[in-house]
């Protein structure tokens, strides 16, 4: 299978999801948008599109003009080609906009290892049906998707007290995930050096929050990585259908 990954900062790649697909012999084409790389014109040659997180926000089209072409590419891939898509964090928000929603400020920001609650529709979802009723996930976001209620093809699969659309699916082939299942053991340290992420962490949890977050992630990382493996395996199945 041929995967396309749209990335917004080099250290935020598909993580363990990437490790699983490469170990299985699939190909991965990475487009580093923040470094000026262009999205391929023939998107239909790819079996799936991944869209990762980043320190920018969806409304920052003036500062990051490539966001405009990225949104168009996601729309082409999901709405016109109807091919499998998986968006994490910023990628989730970009999908939400493409599907007619808005991206709004979270109140409060969600940063840390926090609970996600599965919703009823997850039981019949082919990709996320493995998740338990409540589980822990790494969150690091100040914006979230809203306003998808009028899209009859969107299902809410996971929520938190702050964020309704923690996981949502579109027609059971395109998915947004606001949190991070794809993390490696080095992820928190890697992200903590990004100024925007560091500032958000300290504003939410205090200047000494990093060691506590690392401990919380370490306590859950084996479960998170096993869940990411199941996500990868289920996502691969819909590519084969």
Positions of predicted regions on the chain:
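Cofactor-binding loop segments of dinucleotide-utilizing enzymes, especially the Rossmann-like FAD-
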Residues: 6-8, 33, 90
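Flexible gly/pro-rich beta->alpha loop and the following alpha-helix that scaffold active-site loops
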Residues: 19-85
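Short N-terminal binding/cap micro-motifs at the start of the first secondary-structure element
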Residues: 12-16
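Acyltransferase
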Residues: 183-241
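Extreme N-terminal starter segment of soluble prokaryotic enzymes
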Residues: 1-4
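Pocket-forming structural segment of enzyme catalytic cores
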Residues: 99-186
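Catalytic nucleophile loop
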Residues: 78-102
């Amino acid at each position: 299978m041929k995967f396309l990954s749209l990335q917004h900062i080099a250290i935020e790649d598909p993580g363990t999801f990437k490790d699983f697909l490469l170990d299985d012999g699939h190909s991965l084409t990475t487009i580093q948008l923040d470094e000026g790389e262009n999205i391929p014109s023939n998107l239909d040659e790819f079996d799936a599109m991944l869209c990762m997180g980043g320190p920018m926000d969806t409304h920052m089209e003036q500062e990051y003009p490539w966001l405009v072409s990225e949104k168009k590419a996601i729309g082409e891939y999901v709405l016109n080609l109807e091919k499998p898509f998986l968006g994490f964090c910023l990628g989730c928000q970009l999908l939400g906009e493409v599907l007619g929603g808005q991206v709004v400020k979270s109140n409060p920001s969600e940063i840390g290892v926090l609970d996600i609650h599965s919703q009823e529709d997850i039981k019949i979802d082919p990709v996320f049906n493995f998740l338990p009723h409540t589980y822990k996930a790494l969150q690091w976001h100040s914006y979230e998707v809203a306003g998808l209620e009028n899209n009859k093809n969107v299902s809410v699969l996971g929520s938190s007290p702050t964020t309704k659309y923690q996981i949502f699916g579109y027609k059971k082939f395109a998915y947004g995930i606001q949190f991070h299942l794809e993390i490696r053991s080095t992820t928190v340290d890697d992200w903590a050096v990004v100024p925007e992420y560091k500032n958000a962490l300290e504003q939410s949890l205090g200047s000494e929050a990093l060691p506590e977050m690392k401990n919380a992630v370490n306590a859950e990382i084996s479960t998170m990585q096993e869940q990411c493996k199941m996500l990868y395996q289920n996502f691969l199945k819909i590519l084969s259908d």
